[in-house]
Protein backbone atom coordinates (compact mmCIF):
# COMPACT_ATOMS: atom_id res chain seq x y z
CA UNK A 1 0.00 0.00 0.00
CA UNK A 2 1.70 3.17 -1.16
CA UNK A 3 0.68 6.72 -0.40
CA UNK A 4 1.13 9.81 -2.52
CA UNK A 5 1.55 13.34 -1.22
CA UNK A 6 -2.01 14.46 -1.82
CA UNK A 7 -4.51 16.08 0.52
CA UNK A 8 -4.63 13.06 2.80
CA UNK A 9 -0.90 13.03 3.35
CA UNK A 10 1.32 15.24 5.39
CA UNK A 11 4.54 16.83 4.25
CA UNK A 12 7.22 17.42 6.74
CA UNK A 13 10.55 19.16 6.40
CA UNK A 14 13.82 17.16 6.69
CA UNK A 15 17.07 19.09 6.17
CA UNK A 16 19.15 21.35 8.36
CA UNK A 17 18.01 24.87 9.15
CA UNK A 18 19.66 27.84 7.49
CA UNK A 19 21.75 30.04 9.79
CA UNK A 20 20.38 33.41 8.72
CA UNK A 21 22.75 35.29 11.02
CA UNK A 22 25.51 34.62 8.50
CA UNK A 23 23.51 36.35 5.82
CA UNK A 24 24.18 39.72 7.46
CA UNK A 25 27.97 39.52 7.17
CA UNK A 26 28.43 42.15 4.42
CA UNK A 27 31.90 43.35 3.31
CA UNK A 28 32.64 47.02 4.18
CA UNK A 29 33.18 48.58 0.78
CA UNK A 30 31.56 51.49 -1.05
CA UNK A 31 27.87 52.10 -0.39
CA UNK A 32 26.97 51.01 -3.94
CA UNK A 33 28.87 47.75 -3.64
CA UNK A 34 27.44 47.26 -0.17
CA UNK A 35 23.91 47.66 -1.47
CA UNK A 36 24.55 45.20 -4.29
CA UNK A 37 26.18 42.70 -1.97
CA UNK A 38 23.42 43.20 0.59
CA UNK A 39 20.82 42.58 -2.12
CA UNK A 40 22.60 39.43 -3.26
CA UNK A 41 22.95 38.23 0.32
CA UNK A 42 19.27 38.79 1.04
CA UNK A 43 18.32 37.06 -2.21
CA UNK A 44 20.64 34.19 -1.35
CA UNK A 45 19.08 33.77 2.07
CA UNK A 46 15.56 34.04 0.71
CA UNK A 47 16.25 31.53 -2.03
CA UNK A 48 17.95 29.27 0.46
CA UNK A 49 14.94 29.49 2.72
CA UNK A 50 12.50 28.85 -0.12
CA UNK A 51 14.42 25.79 -1.21
CA UNK A 52 15.07 24.40 2.24
CA UNK A 53 11.73 25.26 3.82
CA UNK A 54 10.29 22.17 2.14
CA UNK A 55 12.95 19.96 3.72
CA UNK A 56 13.64 21.45 7.15
CA UNK A 57 13.46 19.10 10.16
CA UNK A 58 10.05 18.34 11.62
CA UNK A 59 8.61 21.30 13.54
CA UNK A 60 8.52 20.06 17.11
CA UNK A 61 7.30 23.20 18.84
CA UNK A 62 3.97 21.63 19.83
CA UNK A 63 5.10 18.00 20.24
CA UNK A 64 5.06 16.47 23.71
CA UNK A 65 5.08 12.69 23.18
CA UNK A 66 5.64 10.28 20.29
CA UNK A 67 4.55 6.62 20.36
CA UNK A 68 5.78 4.32 17.57
CA UNK A 69 4.51 0.77 17.02
CA UNK A 70 6.11 -1.16 14.16
CA UNK A 71 6.12 -4.63 12.67
CA UNK A 72 9.39 -6.57 12.67
CA UNK A 73 11.57 -6.78 9.55
CA UNK A 74 11.71 -9.46 6.83
CA UNK A 75 11.88 -13.00 8.17
CA UNK A 76 12.30 -16.58 7.02
CA UNK A 77 9.20 -18.83 6.76
CA UNK A 78 7.52 -19.87 10.00
CA UNK A 79 6.10 -23.08 8.57
CA UNK A 80 6.33 -25.49 5.64
CA UNK A 81 3.77 -27.75 3.90
CA UNK A 82 3.69 -31.39 2.83
CA UNK A 83 4.68 -30.91 -0.83
CA UNK A 84 7.02 -27.97 -0.18
CA UNK A 85 10.05 -28.35 -2.51
CA UNK A 86 12.07 -26.35 0.04
CA UNK A 87 11.08 -28.40 3.07
CA UNK A 88 14.71 -29.42 3.61
CA UNK A 89 16.08 -25.93 2.85
CA UNK A 90 18.54 -24.86 5.52
CA UNK A 91 17.63 -21.38 6.69
CA UNK A 92 20.71 -19.94 8.46
CA UNK A 93 18.47 -17.82 10.70
CA UNK A 94 16.16 -20.74 11.49
CA UNK A 95 12.40 -20.74 10.94
CA UNK A 96 10.82 -17.34 11.56
CA UNK A 97 14.22 -15.70 11.97
CA UNK A 98 15.04 -12.10 11.08
CA UNK A 99 17.02 -11.94 7.82
CA UNK A 100 19.79 -9.50 6.97
CA UNK A 101 17.27 -7.69 4.78
CA UNK A 102 14.98 -7.41 7.79
CA UNK A 103 17.78 -6.02 9.95
CA UNK A 104 18.54 -3.37 7.34
CA UNK A 105 14.86 -2.48 6.94
CA UNK A 106 14.47 -1.62 10.61
CA UNK A 107 17.84 0.11 10.77
CA UNK A 108 16.74 2.34 7.89
CA UNK A 109 13.37 2.93 9.57
CA UNK A 110 15.19 4.06 12.70
CA UNK A 111 17.25 6.49 10.62
CA UNK A 112 14.09 7.82 8.98
CA UNK A 113 12.50 8.57 12.33
CA UNK A 114 15.78 10.10 13.55
CA UNK A 115 15.66 12.50 10.60
CA UNK A 116 11.90 12.97 10.84
CA UNK A 117 11.95 13.99 14.49
CA UNK A 118 15.37 15.67 14.39
CA UNK A 119 14.09 18.68 16.34
CA UNK A 120 12.24 16.57 18.92
CA UNK A 121 14.28 13.47 19.73
CA UNK A 122 17.50 14.28 21.56
CA UNK A 123 20.65 13.54 19.58
CA UNK A 124 21.95 11.55 22.54
CA UNK A 125 20.18 8.56 24.04
CA UNK A 126 18.99 9.00 27.62
CA UNK A 127 17.11 6.17 29.31
CA UNK A 128 14.85 8.65 31.12
CA UNK A 129 13.47 9.82 27.75
CA UNK A 130 12.74 6.51 26.05
CA UNK A 131 10.88 3.29 26.77
CA UNK A 132 11.17 0.33 24.39
CA UNK A 133 8.88 -2.71 24.51
CA UNK A 134 8.91 -5.76 22.27
CA UNK A 135 7.28 -9.07 21.60
CA UNK A 136 9.44 -11.81 23.09
CA UNK A 137 9.98 -13.35 19.64
CA UNK A 138 13.62 -13.11 18.57
CA UNK A 139 12.79 -11.39 15.27
CA UNK A 140 10.98 -8.60 17.15
CA UNK A 141 13.72 -8.12 19.74
CA UNK A 142 16.34 -7.99 16.96
CA UNK A 143 14.18 -5.60 14.93
CA UNK A 144 13.92 -3.30 17.94
CA UNK A 145 17.71 -3.43 18.36
CA UNK A 146 18.44 -2.52 14.74
CA UNK A 147 15.73 0.18 14.77
CA UNK A 148 17.39 1.74 17.81
CA UNK A 149 20.80 1.53 16.12
CA UNK A 150 19.42 3.76 13.37
CA UNK A 151 17.49 6.01 15.74
CA UNK A 152 20.30 6.58 18.23
CA UNK A 153 23.78 6.41 16.71
CA UNK A 154 26.18 7.09 19.60
CA UNK A 155 27.23 10.67 20.20
CA UNK A 156 30.96 11.26 20.61
CA UNK A 157 30.87 10.81 24.39
CA UNK A 158 28.87 7.57 24.00
CA UNK A 159 31.36 5.84 21.69
CA UNK A 160 32.85 2.99 23.71
CA UNK A 161 34.59 1.31 20.76
CA UNK A 162 35.83 3.52 17.89
CA UNK A 163 35.49 0.58 15.51
CA UNK A 164 31.83 0.01 16.42
CA UNK A 165 29.51 3.02 16.12
CA UNK A 166 26.71 1.38 18.10
CA UNK A 167 25.48 1.58 21.66
CA UNK A 168 23.38 -0.89 23.66
CA UNK A 169 19.87 0.32 24.48
CA UNK A 170 17.55 -1.66 26.79
CA UNK A 171 14.57 -3.46 25.25
CA UNK A 172 11.90 -4.86 27.54
CA UNK A 173 9.67 -7.86 26.87
CA UNK A 174 7.41 -10.32 28.67
CA UNK A 175 7.26 -14.10 28.14
CA UNK A 176 4.63 -14.86 25.53
CA UNK A 177 2.27 -16.51 28.02
CA UNK A 178 2.25 -13.28 30.08
CA UNK A 179 2.32 -10.68 27.31
CA UNK A 180 -1.06 -9.00 26.80
CA UNK A 181 0.51 -5.66 25.84
CA UNK A 182 2.77 -5.96 22.77
CA UNK A 183 2.39 -9.39 21.15
CA UNK A 184 -0.95 -9.98 22.91
CA UNK A 185 -0.29 -13.70 23.26
CA UNK A 186 -1.39 -14.15 26.87
CA UNK A 187 -4.30 -16.63 26.92
CA UNK A 188 -7.81 -15.16 27.22
CA UNK A 189 -10.72 -17.61 27.44
CA UNK A 190 -13.48 -15.24 26.28
CA UNK A 191 -11.41 -13.95 23.37
CA UNK A 192 -10.53 -17.50 22.27
CA UNK A 193 -14.15 -18.70 22.30
CA UNK A 194 -15.38 -15.67 20.35
CA UNK A 195 -12.51 -15.85 17.84
CA UNK A 196 -12.99 -19.57 17.18
CA UNK A 197 -16.69 -19.00 16.52
CA UNK A 198 -15.91 -16.25 14.00
CA UNK A 199 -13.18 -18.37 12.39
CA UNK A 200 -15.54 -21.32 11.96
CA UNK A 201 -18.14 -19.07 10.36
CA UNK A 202 -15.56 -17.58 7.97
CA UNK A 203 -14.29 -21.00 6.96
CA UNK A 204 -17.80 -21.91 5.79
CA UNK A 205 -17.99 -18.90 3.48
CA UNK A 206 -18.63 -20.19 -0.05
CA UNK A 207 -16.18 -17.71 -1.57
CA UNK A 208 -13.29 -19.71 -0.11
CA UNK A 209 -14.47 -23.18 -1.20
CA UNK A 210 -12.53 -23.37 -4.48
CA UNK A 211 -9.44 -21.87 -2.87
CA UNK A 212 -9.48 -24.43 -0.05
CA UNK A 213 -9.95 -27.32 -2.48
CA UNK A 214 -7.19 -26.16 -4.82
CA UNK A 215 -4.68 -25.61 -2.02
CA UNK A 216 -5.56 -28.94 -0.37
CA UNK A 217 -4.94 -30.80 -3.64
CA UNK A 218 -1.59 -29.15 -4.28
CA UNK A 219 -0.14 -28.92 -0.78
CA UNK A 220 -1.00 -32.52 0.07
CA UNK A 221 -2.69 -31.52 3.31
CA UNK A 222 -6.09 -30.28 4.48
CA UNK A 223 -6.52 -26.56 3.85
CA UNK A 224 -9.99 -25.65 5.05
CA UNK A 225 -9.36 -22.53 7.08
CA UNK A 226 -8.44 -18.92 6.32
CA UNK A 227 -5.90 -19.27 9.14
CA UNK A 228 -4.17 -22.11 7.26
CA UNK A 229 -4.20 -19.97 4.11
CA UNK A 230 -2.70 -17.17 6.19
CA UNK A 231 0.27 -19.36 7.18
CA UNK A 232 0.76 -20.69 3.64
CA UNK A 233 0.56 -17.21 2.09
CA UNK A 234 3.25 -15.99 4.51
CA UNK A 235 5.44 -18.99 3.64
CA UNK A 236 5.21 -18.26 -0.09
CA UNK A 237 6.07 -14.60 0.51
CA UNK A 238 9.11 -15.44 2.63
CA UNK A 239 10.38 -17.98 0.10
CA UNK A 240 9.96 -15.51 -2.76
CA UNK A 241 11.77 -12.78 -0.84
CA UNK A 242 14.65 -15.21 -0.28
CA UNK A 243 14.95 -15.65 -4.06
CA UNK A 244 13.43 -19.13 -4.17
CA UNK A 245 11.18 -20.07 -7.09
CA UNK A 246 7.88 -21.24 -5.66
CA UNK A 247 5.90 -23.94 -7.58
CA UNK A 248 4.09 -23.04 -10.81
CA UNK A 249 0.75 -24.21 -9.43
CA UNK A 250 0.75 -21.31 -6.96
CA UNK A 251 0.23 -18.78 -9.77
CA UNK A 252 -3.48 -19.55 -10.03
CA UNK A 253 -4.16 -18.20 -6.54
CA UNK A 254 -1.01 -16.54 -5.23
CA UNK A 255 -0.73 -13.76 -4.38
CA UNK A 256 -4.05 -12.05 -5.19
CA UNK A 257 -6.76 -14.53 -4.18
CA UNK A 258 -4.80 -15.84 -1.23
CA UNK A 259 -4.15 -12.28 -0.07
CA UNK A 260 -7.86 -11.72 0.50
CA UNK A 261 -8.09 -14.73 2.83
CA UNK A 262 -4.82 -13.72 4.50
CA UNK A 263 -6.02 -10.20 5.32
CA UNK A 264 -9.36 -11.54 6.52
CA UNK A 265 -7.51 -13.91 8.84
CA UNK A 266 -5.48 -11.03 10.30
CA UNK A 267 -8.61 -8.95 10.84
CA UNK A 268 -10.53 -11.77 12.55
CA UNK A 269 -8.24 -11.60 15.58
CA UNK A 270 -9.58 -8.12 16.35
CA UNK A 271 -12.82 -8.34 14.39
CA UNK A 272 -15.11 -6.42 16.74
CA UNK A 273 -15.07 -4.07 19.71
CA UNK A 274 -15.02 -6.89 22.27
CA UNK A 275 -12.09 -8.69 20.64
CA UNK A 276 -10.26 -5.36 20.37
CA UNK A 277 -10.62 -4.80 24.12
CA UNK A 278 -8.76 -8.06 24.71
CA UNK A 279 -6.17 -7.68 21.94
CA UNK A 280 -5.37 -3.96 22.23
CA UNK A 281 -6.84 -2.79 25.53
CA UNK A 282 -3.73 -3.36 27.71
CA UNK A 283 -1.51 -1.61 25.13
CA UNK A 284 -3.89 1.36 24.97
CA UNK A 285 -3.90 1.43 28.76
CA UNK A 286 -0.11 1.75 28.85
CA UNK A 287 -0.22 4.41 26.14
CA UNK A 288 -2.93 6.29 28.06
CA UNK A 289 -0.83 6.26 31.23
CA UNK A 290 2.09 7.88 29.41
CA UNK A 291 -0.15 10.38 27.62
CA UNK A 292 -1.60 11.41 30.98
CA UNK A 293 1.88 11.92 32.44
CA UNK A 294 2.77 14.24 29.56
CA UNK A 295 -0.49 16.19 29.81
CA UNK A 296 -0.30 16.64 33.58
CA UNK A 297 3.41 17.53 33.71
CA UNK A 298 3.78 20.96 35.34
CA UNK A 299 7.45 21.48 34.60
CA UNK A 300 8.54 20.55 38.10
CA UNK A 301 10.48 17.39 38.83
CA UNK A 302 11.68 14.79 36.29
CA UNK A 303 10.05 15.19 32.88
CA UNK A 304 7.94 12.27 31.61
CA UNK A 305 9.22 10.12 28.76
CA UNK A 306 8.93 11.71 25.34
CA UNK A 307 9.24 8.54 23.22
CA UNK A 308 7.68 5.08 23.43
CA UNK A 309 8.70 2.38 20.95
CA UNK A 310 7.04 -1.00 20.43
CA UNK A 311 8.22 -3.86 18.20
CA UNK A 312 5.52 -6.40 17.32
CA UNK A 313 3.85 -8.39 14.56
CA UNK A 314 1.51 -7.74 11.63
CA UNK A 315 -1.48 -8.95 13.68
CA UNK A 316 -0.68 -6.33 16.32
CA UNK A 317 -0.49 -3.52 13.77
CA UNK A 318 -3.83 -4.65 12.29
CA UNK A 319 -5.42 -4.88 15.75
CA UNK A 320 -4.29 -1.35 16.60
CA UNK A 321 -5.51 -0.15 13.19
CA UNK A 322 -8.93 -1.71 13.73
CA UNK A 323 -9.10 -0.35 17.27
CA UNK A 324 -8.90 3.12 15.70
CA UNK A 325 -12.21 2.27 13.99
CA UNK A 326 -10.80 1.47 10.54
CA UNK A 327 -12.57 -1.41 8.82
CA UNK A 328 -10.51 -1.40 5.61
CA UNK A 329 -8.47 -4.58 5.12
CA UNK A 330 -4.80 -4.02 5.87
CA UNK A 331 -1.67 -5.95 4.93
CA UNK A 332 1.18 -4.40 6.92
CA UNK A 333 4.48 -4.98 5.18
CA UNK A 334 7.71 -5.56 7.08
CA UNK A 335 8.50 -2.49 9.17
CA UNK A 336 5.00 -1.01 8.83
CA UNK A 337 4.45 1.50 11.62
CA UNK A 338 1.67 3.39 13.37
CA UNK A 339 2.64 6.61 15.14
CA UNK A 340 0.72 8.56 17.77
CA UNK A 341 1.74 12.16 18.45
CA UNK A 342 0.61 14.24 21.42
CA UNK A 343 0.65 17.99 20.71
CA UNK A 344 -0.07 21.08 22.76
CA UNK A 345 -1.16 24.47 21.39
CA UNK A 346 -1.89 27.49 23.58
CA UNK A 347 -5.21 28.15 21.85
CA UNK A 348 -6.24 24.50 21.28
CA UNK A 349 -4.85 22.69 24.31
CA UNK A 350 -3.72 19.09 23.87
CA UNK A 351 -4.57 17.10 20.75
CA UNK A 352 -3.54 13.82 19.12
CA UNK A 353 -2.39 13.01 15.58
CA UNK A 354 -1.98 9.53 14.14
CA UNK A 355 0.21 8.56 11.17
CA UNK A 356 0.83 5.35 9.22
CA UNK A 357 3.68 3.98 7.11
CA UNK A 358 2.96 0.67 5.37
CA UNK A 359 6.64 -0.16 4.84
CA UNK A 360 10.14 1.16 5.49
CA UNK A 361 10.54 2.69 2.02
CA UNK A 362 7.88 5.37 2.49
CA UNK A 363 9.48 8.73 3.22
CA UNK A 364 6.37 10.66 4.26
CA UNK A 365 3.77 8.92 6.43
CA UNK A 366 0.05 9.30 5.85
CA UNK A 367 -1.88 11.24 8.46
CA UNK A 368 -4.98 9.28 9.43
CA UNK A 369 -8.35 10.93 9.88
CA UNK A 370 -9.98 9.67 13.06
CA UNK A 371 -13.71 9.06 12.69
CA UNK A 372 -14.46 9.42 16.38
CA UNK A 373 -13.29 13.04 16.77
CA UNK A 374 -13.00 16.33 14.90
CA UNK A 375 -9.72 17.63 13.48
CA UNK A 376 -7.56 18.27 15.33
CA UNK A 377 -8.54 15.40 17.61
CA UNK A 378 -8.74 16.92 21.08
CA UNK A 379 -6.98 14.88 23.72
CA UNK A 380 -10.15 14.59 25.81
CA UNK A 381 -12.05 13.15 22.83
CA UNK A 382 -9.25 10.72 22.03
CA UNK A 383 -9.19 9.60 25.65
CA UNK A 384 -12.96 9.20 25.76
CA UNK A 385 -12.81 6.87 22.76
CA UNK A 386 -9.88 4.66 23.82
CA UNK A 387 -11.36 4.34 27.32
CA UNK A 388 -14.13 2.22 25.77
CA UNK A 389 -11.41 -0.23 24.69
CA UNK A 390 -9.56 -0.49 27.99
CA UNK A 391 -10.76 -3.24 30.36
CA UNK A 392 -10.79 -2.40 34.07
CA UNK A 393 -9.62 -5.93 34.85
CA UNK A 394 -8.35 -7.78 31.77
CA UNK A 395 -8.02 -11.18 33.44
CA UNK A 396 -11.49 -10.93 34.97
CA UNK A 397 -13.10 -10.02 31.64
CA UNK A 398 -11.19 -12.87 30.00
CA UNK A 399 -12.57 -15.17 32.69
CA UNK A 400 -9.09 -16.51 33.21
CA UNK A 401 -8.78 -18.86 36.16
CA UNK A 402 -6.48 -17.33 38.79
CA UNK A 403 -3.42 -19.44 39.60
Predicted segment positions?
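Signature for phosphate-centric chemistry
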Residues: 2-131, 135-403
Amino acid sequence: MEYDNEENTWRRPSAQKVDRSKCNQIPKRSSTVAVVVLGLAVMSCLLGYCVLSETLPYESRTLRLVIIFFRHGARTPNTSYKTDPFKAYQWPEGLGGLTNTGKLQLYELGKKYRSYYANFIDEEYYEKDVQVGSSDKSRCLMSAATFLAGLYPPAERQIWNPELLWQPIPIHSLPRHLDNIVASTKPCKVWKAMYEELLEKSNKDAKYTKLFEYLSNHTGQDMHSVLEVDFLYSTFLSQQEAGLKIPEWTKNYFPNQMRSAFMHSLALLSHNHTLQRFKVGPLLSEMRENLEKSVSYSGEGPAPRSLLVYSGHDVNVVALWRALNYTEALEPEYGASLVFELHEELDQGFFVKVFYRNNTKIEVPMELKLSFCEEPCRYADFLQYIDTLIPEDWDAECQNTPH
